[in-house]
UniProtKB/Swiss-Prot annotation:
Gene3D superfamilies: Gamma-tubulin complex, C-terminal domain. It is found in: Cytoplasm, Cytoskeleton, Microtubule organizing center, Spindle pole body. One of its GO terms (biological process) is microtubule nucleation. Signal peptide: none annotated. Keywords: Cell cycle, Cell division, Cytoplasm, Cytoskeleton, Microtubule, Mitosis. This is Spindle pole body component alp4. The keyword Plastid does not apply.
Amino acid sequence: MVRSISSVLAKEESENGSPIPALEEGSVYHVSLKSEGVSPFSDRIQLNYLYDGKTFSDPSNLNIHQQEACLINELLNAFMGMEGVFVHLQDMKASSEFETIIMPPSFYILPGFDLGIKDIASEMLEMGSHYLSITAFIESRSHFEYGFVNHALCAALRKFVMDYVVLIMQCENQSRIDPNFSLQTLRLYTLPTSRSLRQVYLILRDLLLSMEKNASSSDDLGLSNIDDLLEQLNEGNDISHVVNATRSKKKVCKGGQVISFLTESLTKYAGDPVARKILTYLLREASRPYTKMLNEWIHLGLVNDPYDEFMIKIHKGITSMQLDEDYTDEYWEKRYVIREDQVPPQLLDLQNKVLFAGKYLNVVLECRKGVNNLASLNAKDDTQNQLLWPSTFDDDNFTLNIMNAYVYANESLLQLLQSSQSLYAHLYSLKHYFFLDQSDFFTTFLDNAQHELRKPAKYISITKLQSQLDLALRQPGTITATDPHKEYVTVEVNQTSLIDWLMHIVSISGLEEGTSSQGNEVWNESITKQADVGNETRNFESEHNRSTQGTSKVGSDKDINGFETMQLCYKVPFPLSLILSRKAIIRYQLLFRYFLLLRHVEMQLENSWVQHSKNSAWRLNSSNAKIEQWKRNSWLLRTRMLSFVQKIIYYTTSEVIETHWGKFMGELENARTVDNLMQEHIDFLDTCLKECMLTNSRLLKVQSKLLNTCAMFASYTSTFTRSLYLLENSEESFDEGRMDKMEEILRRYEDSFSRHLKSLVNACNYFASTETAALLSLVMKLTG
């Protein structure tokens, strides 16, 4: 490549007629391997075309043409990053790899040349520095830890460098065969490439500087991803080893970060055609491995990311096998998550669709039938389909490819849930069990379990309750006897009363009177937090005992019985647990406990009526007018209370549950995505909770006081009966004091019930105008 200057010097000697004084006799010019080269790449074997320890002639002794020919040879060396006789590199022995890329060593020309040609040559020398920077970047980023995207970027840069080398070879060849080849000609040939080379250098420099800035702003301990550390600790690694390895691990720019930088640079250099052309080429080539990982994720549900450079992160410690023991949707929420720093700008608006497309396919893969179907599909069409998948971000079908994959994944999972997993049948079973729809089995269960349910919550035997529930579910003639899903129903005892639990959730969410839809979103987040605790009842109980006081006897934890603490649980296998998740089941449990509380108060009032009807003290007319009037007032109050409870039950079941259930099933029929299905399910439950007055602190308190008054009055029936016996059968004179006391007690119940009922009506009127218009129907029933 390098043109020898011996002929030039020999010609000079013959013309002058005397030998060159600076040269020793018998000296020979040849290529030698210099062991202590000053090149920044001296750690590698590199050829330095230097005169072997001899002193060179002063270039000022050469004529202008000889100097130009000499500099052409020197420049061809410098263009390849090598020193020559008269062109040398600055001393860069102490430079690091990073400094070599950011600030590559510059070449300089020894003095003695004509200033005109020296200036021309000096302008072209930066090509050699840029070449050194680019080759240093290629070598450093080709290591395996930098990932596929950096490897693809380096491959694109190598192709660019190869074109550059071909140009230098062509220039060298032209200089040999063309006697008129001059520095100006060389400059003309290399000028476009010089601009491109400089642009590539600037791009790579900015890339490294931006990454260095991000690395310096990250945490010193390297604990930015706590999930990775926890996974390593769960695998049995020592904590000191994990932390030290994390600290020593160098943070590198790779994957989506590289693509993001190149994309942002396209905008930055929008007005520079040369830079834009280079960036478009680099982005296209660098995005190929990323696009391949993207296609494998959205079309196959697989993550092939050994270098953690893809936008989807997989937590290997979370598997679907855990869902057999715990029906949480943690697998859905946490197993696959988005790496925010690895999302390219091209996917920012599509990142959720990318995430869910792969998730849906992954769920299908977890099911045996889905695996068979997907395997047969892949075996048949995989090769042909992969040829149609976009390979770069600038493909015209890039966005359409993601949307089609998203639609296909949705349809696959929806079909799986609706057909083989019998989702609709499970939803109807939940309605029977939790909303007490056609609940003949539940009446039988309450009759059999009432002795156990009357005990304080801490003394209740869950085993007995479960046995009695199983007997009721299997009783011939009931709707549940033929239900194939009754095996999923179990009994639990929540040590906290319903009202206190709801008040706690409301206090967390910060809902106040008159809150709007924004408050409802906070409610949704708050109730979701209960699902994330793991075992809500035990954790909440300990916190409640420290910070919450009961609002009433019905809501008091001191002596609550099984009627106030019992709840059902519904455990389903994966993938149904994605729809019937813990978040959804908690909502079902809240509604069930509310309906059970209403049914229990209704049963107490009905039992009170039975006692009044059968007991002679109530049934027979009294000769005392005051006693007879007191009994009529007591009957009337009990009737008012029973009517109130029955109106609440009718409103919540017939006008809230049934009305929204029909709408919900209609929305399910029209659902086109699994996300829509899950959202419609949660929206249905939240609407029911809201219209059942379970999401508002004021309505909760008033309901609690009303139900407490009704329950206490019903439980006081036996005391009233004994007092009537004493008054009717007293051998002595009529006990006016006892009668006055009975009238005072009854008047207190009447006042309490009337006052709280009026408060409930006023509150319903207010919230019907600000939040839920459905409450107007309840107001009309309560005031009718």
